[in-house]
Amino acid sequence: MREMAEDIEEIRRRKLMELQRKYLEQQKAQEEAERQQALIEAQIQAILRKILTPEARERLARVKLVRPELARQVELILVQLYQAGQITERIDDAKLKRILAQIEAKTRREFRIKW
């Protein structure tokens, strides 16, 4: 009877250690993913600082407050164009407005209510 209780206790202890190990592994993986995401975001922001004028960056920041998905799409497109060498001069506020309008027109969804 005593051996059985000790065996059960040993099984519980092993299971607890295994769960703790898995939890620590998941936590480390999550921290690594967050660190990678922060690094990518820092790289994106560095590129945007290079290619956007201060006024254009301010406009993009305001767009991000209202339409974060649109702002993110514009950021990624600008970074891709920069990396492909297609952006040769800084983008000012007027150019950014045109880019935003073009992307908005392509992604706009129309809702029609019929009576």
Swiss-Prot record:
Pfam entry (one): dsDNA_bind
InterPro entries: DNA_bind_arc, PDCD5-like, PDCD5-like_sf
Single GO cellular component term: cytosol
Keywords per UniProt: DNA-binding
A GO molecular-function descriptor: DNA binding
ATP-binding listed as a keyword: no
Family (UniProt): Belongs to the PDCD5 family.
The name this protein goes by in its record: DNA-binding protein PH1060
